[in-house]
């Protein structure tokens, strides 16, 4: 039996990719709590300049990731997903190490851009698992996989702040590089993929990829949904701490309260994502997606009228439980409506839309709050999500029957 015919243990691959997504999510969020402090340490002074450069070094990673993702997705479809996971983990490890050696803000900005160019571990992990799991378990598996990055993102800021306080800012970058290198080793030795490389001349062009889809308009609507999910999340991020401070009044532990309220949606998503993914496998991910979007709207509106941090925290916990279903449902529908031959590009296109949302969301939130106040941000975000719920309902209505009955290509 050839290596290409050897059965794949998809459960082992799911476990290892979950761990890889956890380490990647932790690595990225390790440096987030002190990013403005590191910018200041590199010589940027003055309130306006510090805000500008902090925003630039944060956003440029997502911007370059959006640009590079389709290229890496095409390469994954041609060369295999495992090699893309290895490239991403090792590349990000080297870049993180170099960040710890940066001597000025321009070097750091360039390295943040390079980090975006070399990233892509999580979308390639999704593509790998999507091509290996039994189709009737797609929702559960992708929901479970999504909790890896969420778990890492929750733990990262806590660990990063502790490490920075005790060993300094630069040391955290070196530790982050080590974490990513461990991710590389796990991927190298524990992930298995049977992939036959495809000649470049046999690869479909981007136009041919979309022409090959049974429902290209549906797939495009799923990309838009991913963008809006990130816009909705990112629009609240810049004003959350300030909004909590307004609600809490003069208290000494505002940072702790804000951190808790920022974290509770992720905790709720950890609990809900696998369960709602399994439910989606039974009743259809399109139903889960629409209901979760509507619930999100109904929870965002009262956030504009809360009077205490506790009220806001409860609503954000419930919002996180609903949000835990959104991206796994989108990813499952992408699996149902594409083939394994193009899954790398489909997931990379989706990642590009997410990255665009990550860039534009904070800009929208900051602009709305500057002109209309903190409370208006939640109403505007609710309006954006409501539009998405209506748009998704119309897009999913006609092809819902096909989307919930995946049988377009075989899996191991």
UniProtKB/Swiss-Prot annotation:
- Which locations, inside or outside the cell, does it occupy? Cell inner membrane
Q: Name one GO molecular function term.
A: transmembrane transporter activity
Keyword annotations from UniProtKB, A to Z: Cell inner membrane, Cell membrane, Membrane, Transmembrane, Transmembrane helix, Transport
What InterPro entries does the record point to?
MFS, MFS_dom, MFS_MdtG_subfamily, MFS_sugar_transport-like, MFS_trans_sf, Mutidrug-R_MdtG, Tet-R_TetA/multi-R_MdtG-like
What's its membrane topology? Multi-pass membrane protein
Top-rank taxon = Bacteria
Tell me the NCBIfam families matching this sequence: PRK09874.1
Name of the featured protein: Multidrug resistance protein MdtG
Organism annotation? Klebsiella pneumoniae (strain 342)
Give the lineage: Bacteria, Pseudomonadati, Pseudomonadota, Gammaproteobacteria, Enterobacterales
Q: Which gene encodes it?
A: mdtG
